[in-house]
Every structure is written in C-alpha cells, then in structure tokens.
C-alpha cells in the first residue's frame, strides 16, 4: 500500500449510511441493488475528503465525522463497540485471536429482527383502529430504535451525478444513479460465505502442521475479513428492510386514519342532509339532494375500492400469520369470524353495510400483521381457525403449501410490497375525498335534536334474557360449522358435535318461557288500575268465578273440594241465593224505589235464615261472605263500565250528527265518513279506550275537508 497516492476504490473505508428511503421507490430489496436516498447520507465534502482517505491508514487520527455513533446501523444494541479497521502493530509479535473473533461476531445479523418486531407490534397496537381512546398518549420513544437508522446530518451535496464504477464499501458496492439515488449491491452472500469459511478452516486444521506459520495467519485473516464483510452486509440489509417495513407500516396507518376520518365526516354529513330533508322544508332541498347523491357516490366508491383492495392483499398476508395468535387477536379486538365470513362472501348493497364490512376488514388486516409468525413453529397452529380461513379465502391452504420456509426478512419484503400498493390507493382515495371537501360546509350547521347514538343496538336484550342466550347458542353452532375441515368431509365426530348443540338449543328453547314473558308485557286496561267512585273490590287476591272465566280455563289445574254435609236448609239457601242474584241483576237498571224494596226483601229473607248460618263453620261462613262480596263488586264494576261506555258513545254520535248537519253531508257520504254507518257489533273499536282515537280521526277528517 503506497502512502503518496490516493487509495483506490477497493481500499475505501466503509460508509456510515443514515438515510430516509423514498416511499415512491419501485425497486425491491431483493433485486440486484439496494436503493437509498442521497439527501440524508453522511458524506465527505471536498474540504475533508483528503482527511477522510488519510484516516484509513491511521485509525487513531479519525475525525469526529467518521466515528460511528450509537444510532449507526452497525452498532444498534451495542454502545461500547465501534468498528474500525483491524490493525496489527509492527512491534506486536503475538496477538489475541479470541478478541478479534469476538469483535467480528459481536453483531449477529438476526438479532435486529426481534427488536424490530416488538416495535412493529407496538406501532400497530397503538394505532387509531385498535386503540381509539389513547393512541395519542402511547407514543414509543426508544434510545435504540429501528427508526434511528436515519439521522439528519451533513448532506452529501458533492456526490457526482453519475458514477460509472461501483465504490466498494463494507455494506456492498455503492453507485449513484441519475435521479440522485444511491444503490447498494451486496457482493458477499452471508450463508455461502459462512459455509465456505467453515470448510476452509476445517481443511486448514486438518492439513496444516505449523499452527503459527505466517502463511496460515494470512489465510485466517483473509477468511475473517470476508466473514466480517458478509456479516456487515447482511446486518445492513436486514436493518434496512426492517427500517423500511416499519416506515411503510406507519405511513399506511397514518393514511388509513386520515381516510377513516374523512369517510366518517362524509357519512355524518350524509345523515344530516337526509334528516334535514325530512324535518324541514327549505328552498335548498334540490341542492341538498344533489349533494347527498355526490356524498353517497364518494362513500360507495371509497368503501368498495378499499374493501376489494384489502380483500386482495389479505390472503397474501394471512399465510404468514400464526393461526393461534390470530385467533387470540380476533377475540381480543372483537372480530367475529362468522361475521367476517358473511361480509366477505355475500354482496352488500346498502351504504351502512359497506362501511361496516370495510371497518371489519381493516381490523382483521391489522390482526394479521400482529400475528406474523416469528418462530417458524407450525405445530402450534389453531386447526379451527385454519379451517375457517380456508372457507373465507378458498385458496388459503394452497398458498400455505406453496409458501417458502421460515424467512422473516422475506416475509417483511413481501409485506412492504403489499402495503406499497395499499398506500398508493389510500393516497388516491384521500385526494378524491379532499377535492370534494366543500360539500361538508355547503349548508349552515343544523342543531340535531337527536342525542341518541348513531347506530341503534341491534340486540337490546340483557344477558339474562332467554332470547339472548338462544342467540349465543346459534353463534356457537356457527363457529363449529366453520371449524369443520371440508377437505376430509364431515366426520362422525363433527356430526355428533353439531347434533348435540342443536339438541341443547331445542331443549333450552322448549323449557324457556319467552312467550309467557312477552304476553305479560301488555298494556293493562285503565279500568283495572284506576277505579273512580266507590267500589267493593277489597279482596284483590281472590277472584270471582266470572272474572276467572274471562282469562280462560285451565283443565290441568287441580281443584280442592271441601266436603260439607248438605242438608235441606243448605239446598234451600243456595236456591234462594241464585234467585236473589237474578233479581238483583234485573232490578239494577230500575228506579231507586224498587232497589229499596229489593233491599227490604233481601234483608227480610236473610232474617229468616239467620238460624241456618249458625250451623256452618267459620271457614264456610268466611268463604260464602267472600264470594258474595266479590260477586257484588264485579257486578257493580261491570254495570258502571257499561253505563260509562254507553254515555261516551252517545256523546260521540251526537257530535258526529252535528258535524254532518254543519258540513251538509249527504246520506251515502255520511255513511262512509262516520262510524255510525256500521253497527257497533261490527266495529273493531268499541271499547272506552278507543274513544280518543275516534276523536282524533274525526278531527283529521274535519281538517282535510
């Protein structure tokens, strides 16, 4: 190596790269070259270029710009280590091989993946969709973050626009394209270099006799240099891919949040215009209809485009997910697998259904990203979830079988390419929504009187309700049906499970009393709860035979009979009681004088039978007294109701007759207009409770005329 000439490209030190990659880059990471931005790379200006190259020969004279920092991609997770050219002093006769080898293998290329995946999961969990309440309070700030791969520093402004030869660095060969992008080409394959080095060292150990020969040291040093370069290039490549993956995920989450906010605003505006057109009558109603149609078209376009895009990329993401973890995340974030199946396989036409299925699919995509398989252990997969995914996505099992072996970096590369297409669609949808933003502020804001929630709860039953429990049984049957592996057919075990669930549901439905609960929740007549005037209904716990017959007879009910010795006086007493009740019913509508005579006769007859009642026991006397009081109270109440109803309908007929005279209706028209054209026996509204409705109908007919 000469000291009076500039070192060649092969002797250039490793560049310290801290770059923000452009999201519009089309080249993949597995292509022939790696792409970086040139705006944010620490470089060397003309003033310090000579110093930069001279420090390669004198490591102790390295400037502060060439020293690696804690955010360098080569030392993430290691603060006490800096990489510099390995030199051996001239006076050093023996040096420690263990120290050199430990420094070479200190950075494992695979260690960055686990650190990245924790930050990757944290970014998704704290997103707008999975943590709506506290996502702005849970930002992650780490000293050793994957995002520290890029740090703004001195710009490389003097990079030539074209560089024909590649410059060799420890991260690969560097070249500059016309669009100011930096391309890195990996020239040391990590696995092949490790295997080749291991074979060479094995052969040296087998055939080399002199362990301290200078030739052996030179060969070993060359092997260690090659291993070191392969480790650095693989580490840089993995760190770069993880950085771009996390960057793309954050951009997609931000775009999803912006699109979701705009869709929510348009949906609210659409509801306001629709409600305003029904509530108020304004002159701008034609403009409102026009704007509502535009908003509906925007919402349908946005929801359909995003839904079908997610539907196309989710099958490519879910094959990399661990089904057991995916099942846990779906349960945690309230994603119902049968509901996902119905929304993914059926056609939805209404706007609310389109927005709901889009929201459901977005959450499912994030759950798929959270459950990416980082262990490569497929033995712990959830069989039920796998069968359900095979029904939701018909080619799921075929894709899983064609998938390559466990390779997390390859998985992240595929995810970045899928998210890049989704991000471009989100940008297009967001531009379209922003172009029509003036519709959101076209009218003055109306104050909404409806303070209820936007969407009524579909199932308003409590957990203790029988119907709610029956729906839970049906949901369990749906989950069992989706968990059946259709490739092997329906086995006897699956059939028995479904039949047992159905039998449990049928048994539960038969034993429940849902119909009884519904029948009890009926409107009670005001005459049964509100009693005007004096009445004798003092024993509400007991019911008379006449009132019990109205509710229906129960032939299965047991009746207790009391054995009483019947005599001639008892039979005579029963006959006279029946005659008294019939006499009382006939004379209730007569004058007060006849009632007084009836009372006198009644008292007189009772006075004749006073000695007969002394022969009865206390219980028999109490029972007879209760029956008589209940009978009198029931007859009194029914008589008052009949009288009140007759008077009310008489007043109604008089009012109808006066209106017919006032408006001059002819006989046929009057027969069609009023209810007196039909007899009351044919009228469905013949109770006292329906009279207010008849008055309202009369008022409406009068207003329309």
UniProtKB/Swiss-Prot annotation:
Position of the signal peptide: none
Keyword Membrane: yes
Gene Ontology terms describing biological process: peroxisome inheritance
Subcellular location: Peroxisome membrane
Disulfide bonds: none
Top-level taxonomic group: Eukaryota
CC annotations in GO: cytoplasm; peroxisomal membrane
Entry's transmembrane regions: 215-231
Glycosylated sites: 275, 343-344, 379, 517, 569, 574
Keywords: Glycoprotein, Membrane, Peroxisome, Receptor, Transmembrane, Transmembrane helix
Coiled coil: none
Molecular-function GO terms, alphabetical: protein-membrane adaptor activity
Membrane topology qualifier: Single-pass membrane protein
Assembly and oligomerization: Interacts with MYO2.
Family: Belongs to the INP2 family.
Annotated function: Required for peroxisome inheritance. Acts as the peroxisome-specific receptor for the myosin V motor MYO2.
Additional comment: Present with 736 molecules/cell in log phase SD medium.
Descriptive protein name: Inheritance of peroxisomes protein 2
Organism this protein belongs to: Saccharomyces cerevisiae (strain ATCC 204508 / S288c)
